[in-house]
Amino acid sequence: MKKIGIVGSGLVGSLQAILMAKKGYDVSVFENRPDLRKAKLLAGKSINLALSDRGLKALREAGIEEDIKAMSIPMYKRCMHAVDGTLSYQQYGKEDQAIYSVPRGGLNQKLMNLADKYPSIKYNFNRKCKDVELNTNTLIFENLETKEEEKHAFDSIFATDGAFSAVRFRMQKTPMFDYSQKYLDHGYKELVIPANEDGTHKLDKNCLHIWPRGEFMMIALANMDGSFTCTLFFPMFGEKSFDTINTKEKVSAFFNETFADTIPLMPTLLDDYMENPTSSLVMVRCSPWNYEDKILLLGDSAHATVPFYGQGMNCGFEDCTIFGEMLDAANGNWDGLLSAYSKERVPDGNAIIDLSLRNYVEMRDLTGNKEWLLRKKIESKFNDLHPDKWLPLYSQVTFSHIRYNKVVQNGVEQDAIMEQVMKLPNIEEKWDSQEVMDKMLSLV
């Protein structure tokens, strides 16, 4: 039986372990940290994730789609909070289409518990990856409990150890390996809207709440316990930034001016802001994602992105399903498979980073913009009439399995068409008229 080593027991690593075990492989998973199922889950690293169709497909293949949906909250639309407290809504897709707010820790635990049911999967915690012997495909770990060095050789290795992957660091020293990382000027901080005393939510739980403010924004996603996890995306430095808004007095003044409608909802705001960590946002691009037929990067180790399309986990899960499909198509023959996968998938990894950056501008600058909202209404109406001719960009990313790279190309074409449509005289009054729909039909 082929022996598989997986470095990293996070979401992608645990899912890949399950999918490989289902295909009959012997899998060993190594994790730097202790078993998170025995640790208290701490805030800091986003505890809500937006699960959408690409990720759901992978969970379906693992056999736990319904289990995960049962611990998540469907979000059917965005709710935009203006500075004056006015609310406006935008449907994500068709009436029944939703993205799901799912707790990172709970999802990770569920995947690990499912993996434990496979006798062919073994978890090894407190193992820090120090190096990889490429010629023998041997992983070298420090056992953090005994302080001893351990060596484990495998037929194939999957690196799912995140944006600062130790395995990728070794691959970076090989010839012709391209690598870049870039930090966003903005970071993020987690805050909380607690549940009402009776355990109900203070805001509509079936919306993703956004406070768009131009240079920055805050979002809130519902938790099963009635609370919301809020994330403030804010410049790291500058006049209004994490660097300068650094006392309780300044935080109070800033929120009263900028997010006034949240003040009554957030009784622990000042303590949360001062005590919770400020985290940075990093993007990683690299190529190739494989080393010979031995090692393959999956998830953030290959393509760490920023969270503004809610696609980090979904893209990582899609990595696993696409690899599985290619392995099946090759009838289990690994010769040249990792290289073929890398060539196929790298353009999509780059594309989701580009799409995520674009969506950040859209979320913080445009969701409050009347012209942008009108454009979205026109697109939605045309999509209702001609679903075979037009799928809005957001739906292509979130509710389809179209390759991310193709989505980028489609987006460029759609932008060019909508630019012409938005220039039509009196478009604000006649946006849903037959004339406008016919014009779009002539352009697609």
Predicted segment positions?
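Conserved N-terminal helical subregion
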Residues: 2, 21, 52-192, 442-443
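Conserved mid-domain beta->alpha element of the FAD-binding
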Residues: 9-22, 158, 191, 277-368
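Conserved Rossmann-like nucleotide-cofactor binding loop
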Residues: 12, 35, 164
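Glycine-rich FAD pyrophosphate-binding loop
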Residues: 21-43
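Acidic/histidine metal-binding catalytic segments
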Residues: 70-74, 122, 259-274, 331-340, ...
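Conserved FAD-binding catalytic core of PHBH/FMO-like flavoproteins
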Residues: 113, 118, 127-131, 136-281, ...
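C-terminal helical "tail/cap" subdomain of flavin- and related membrane-associated enzymes
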Residues: 325-444
